[in-house]
Amino acid sequence: MLRIAIQTKGRLNEQSVELLREIGIDVEGAKRKFLSKAANFPIEVLYLRDDDIPQVVAEGTASLGIVGMNEVAERGCDVEVVTKLGFGGCRISLAIPKAEEYSGVEYFQGKKIATSYPEILSKFLKENGVEASMAVITGSVEIAPAAGIADAIFDIVSSGGTLVSNGLKEVERVFESEAVLIANRNLSAEERELLDELLFRIESERVSRGKKYLLMNIPTSSLDEAVKILPAMRSPTVMPLAAEGWCSLHSVVDSADLWDKVRQLKAIGAEGILVLTLDKIIP
């Protein structure tokens, strides 16, 4: 039996639960409890504050955890970062009052910086030869300059809207983060086998993101050119049609390239193009 720790609430909770659901692990309604079992996979889900997850996994109370890489780096716990998950993206940046002139990291020499991430900030300042003091606070870091608590802040930035509304501007991107799957370093053989199954499912879900399945009819005379246009997984699937001189072509493309590919295919005679959403791709 595995035990996986995820965030109690918020966007990362929702995305973690959605990932589990996408890979066939149903935890519907489970966040009303502190600990719950999945009905269809040998796993328990433990709901915690995000900053507690690395320590709980390192100590072995949970086998696995889904948490931001920023929390892993800040807590410094000895865990295995198994894989990036492709969601929960953010950055931790230095920001200063909008009216201030910024000339580079030397700006922070002798300044006081408010943050909830003193370890990551300390490492950055040391690497850049900057001596600054810190005001370590939890929550509402962005109000610190206006409240006279600090000269600048070091905090999570997603869209930047919160900074703007508090009269701040981002001047240094220090740490890029996203959700990661972490594991205790001393998993049993049984736990490791279950983790491998989870990873297989996660990879199948991940490779299907941003993909579309194309089906079309195309003149046989244009087939070689169409194959060059379409990357597919290995090569496109080609099937003859009852109508002489025509075939059916199936392929997978990135969503970002879809309309460009369709334009090229139409130009060489493709007809009846169907675009389907992919649920899973099994590697």
Language-model-derived ranges and their functions:
Residues 1-42, 67-80, 84-91, 99-283:
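Small-molecule-sensing regulatory modules
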